[in-house]
Every structure is written in structure tokens, then in C-alpha cells.
Amino acid sequence: MLRSLRRRGLYLRLIGLVVLLAAMYIAFMTNKYYLLFITNLVFFAAIVLAWNIIGGYAGQLDLGTTGYMGVGAIVSSILSNNIGLHPLISIILGGLSSALLAGAIGFPMFRFGVREVWYALSTAAIVVILNNAVRLLIGPYEYYLRVRPIKTYDELYLATSIALVLVFLLNHAVNNSRLGYYLKAIREDELAAEAIGVDTRRYKLLALMIYAFIVGSLGYLYVVMIGYFYTYRFFDTGISVSIAILGIIGGLGSIEGCLVSAFLLRGVGEYLRTSLAHIIPGLHLLLYGAVLITLGVVEPEGIPGIARRFTTLLKTTKRPVGGVK
């Protein structure tokens, strides 16, 4: 009974997501600028959902997103362009390379008990190290990677939408699996999880590698979107921090909350950038930061907390005066 209800709920959420993606495409398909704009939103929604696995379920504040995405982008682009592998195979291998890198990094950190703020600082430092390593290999300027299997913005939107749906389904699979239960136990109280027999190192490492595989695979799409490989964009701690912020405001472990946060807040940020950046440089960042701070102060639990408040308000307004039915 419970399983059938969960399955029905998943189907309804999946249909809702597909309808939303289709409606966005129909609304903006005639305007290439706005089509690329919503493609960017869909892409970052997939990235935020990937972060939700390590940050939302496992409770690890990971700031290395762009590092794994950049490594996956380089590997998949070179395999596709220079060696001639099929783009899909290249994407998978790029994701695997990021997952292996995450495993090599995460194993010693979890083995020696690196956690909380020290884990966040370590992952941010990894992005800086990777940035400088790549600059030594390909130079300090933009590097053109000739990857254009996707010829139109319509195809690019379709590809990013498929990626988002797949990451959405993977989140649900993790959430309702034994892995998800263990990760949430680790998030709530790691010492208590260890006390009841959960191998916290193993499951945190597994969550890290799954997350790195997803963002590494998505790195190829990011190269296709912008056309160039910019080291300062692919290995940017600022983008990693913004993704973590979107995941936190979306609610740790909340799939729908992360989607709302990514679409809404990322959309607001991009709108402010395109509207105000030419007026006063940096004004859009100031306003965007003010929006994030306000959300954090008003509702520390993020989007789920706002949804609960709104639901409670609706129930209160429907109740007759004096509580008499």
C-alpha cells in the first residue's frame, strides 16, 4: 500500500516536471535568447539536484561542484573531439573520471574524519588546485573545445531537460532506498548513525561519487552551452558556493524545494544580471545577495518552511470564526 502510494506520487511529480518543461519550451521557443535563458535554468536545476545527494541527504557541505564539472567537461570533450568517441560514451567516461577523482579525494578525508566546516574548506581548496593545474596544462586563457553535436538551441534544451528528468528520478531512487535512509541518518547525527552500525565513511563516499559522476557528466553540456572552456567559469568557487546556497534554501533533502530554488532564485539572479549589470557594475550581486539573506532570515528552513507556512495560513483562513464548523 505504502509502496503504491509512493509510486503514484512519483508519477504525479514526474508528470508535473515534464509538463513544466514543455510549457517553458512552448512559451519561449520563438525567442532564442529566452530559450537559452531557460536552458541555463534547467541545467543548473540538474546541478542543484545532484548536489542534493551529497549536501541534502548526507549533510556534507560540498563546495567542489565546479571542480568535478570541469574535469568531466575536459575528459568528455577531448574523448569526443580528439579521439572520436560517441558523445554519449564520452559523457559517461567524463562522469566516471569525476567520480574516480571524488573517490580519490573523499577516501582520505572521510578516513581521517574531515567533516563540517573543514570538509567545506577542503572541497573549496580542491577547486582552486584544479583551476591552477588546468591553467598549467592548457594556458590561462579560454580554450576552444570543438563540441557541437547539438546544433540548435531546441536540441540543447531537450538534452538538458532529459538530464534534469534523469537526475530527478535518481534523487527519488536514492531518497527511497537504504542508501538514502543511511545518508539521512548521517546528516541528522553521524555519531549516532555509527553507533547503530552504519558505515558512515562508506556511504558518504558513495554519495560523493554519485554526485561527482552526475556533475561530471553534465560538464559536457555546459561546454556545448557556452562554446568555450573557460577555466575561471569551470573552476569557480563562486559558482560552487551559489549551487550550495540554492540547495540549502531549497531545503536539505527536498527534491521539489531544490527545483523551486533553482528555477526561481537562479532566474531572479540572471534577470538582475541582464537588467542591472550595465547600469551599475555589481548592483545585481548586491540585490541578489539581499534576496538570499532575506530568505535565510525569514525562513531558515528554506522553501519547505515557506510552503508549510503558506499551507498553515490557508488552513487558518478557511477555518470558521470561533472554530465552529
Language-model region placement:
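Loop-to-helix entry region at the N-terminal start of transmembrane alpha-helices
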Residues: L35-T39, V147-L169, L285-G289
